[in-house]
Amino acid sequence: MKKQTQSLIICSTILALLVSILILLISMPNSEITDTSTSESVSIPEAFISKKIEDISKIQIKNLENEVNIVANKNEGNIEFTIPELASKNVSKTNVEDFVKEILNMSPIQVVQENVDDLSTYGLNGDVPSISVFDDSGGKVVLKLGAEAPLSMGNYLRINDEHKVYLISPFYAELFKKFNKSII
């Protein structure tokens, strides 16, 4: 009986200690979340294309095999994306719209290097796969896919003719490579 009482007292003490630690942790302000103005290293990457889906007029995808255009047909507030080159095939409209959304949401993992002089280091010289996004106001953003990064971390990417190189995830890199298979 004495041993059971002793075990009960020890367990109760441990439980009380854990509850007090929990209360302390809950009541403490989380400085990492609430004070983001002082932390410059923590940032949420923004999408490369700052347009809404309603503002897009055309997306042109070029890879080493072929070129495909996704055209926005706008009628009374409704948008439907079509692919003229694949008009004879049964293309899923939902898949095409999802593909467009994925392109518009594409964001970098990180900036690899700014002021790059030798683009060949990143596989961004010559003919490379690209995605050009055209908007209704005549604007154009060209995303150029470079070589695969070490350790399969993703691929290098360049925007327009900037001398800045980004790293994108393998998921986004696939949008440049197998677009026609993923849409159908």
Feature locations, PLM:
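A short-motif feature that recognizes glycine-rich, charge-decorated loops
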Residues: M1-I184
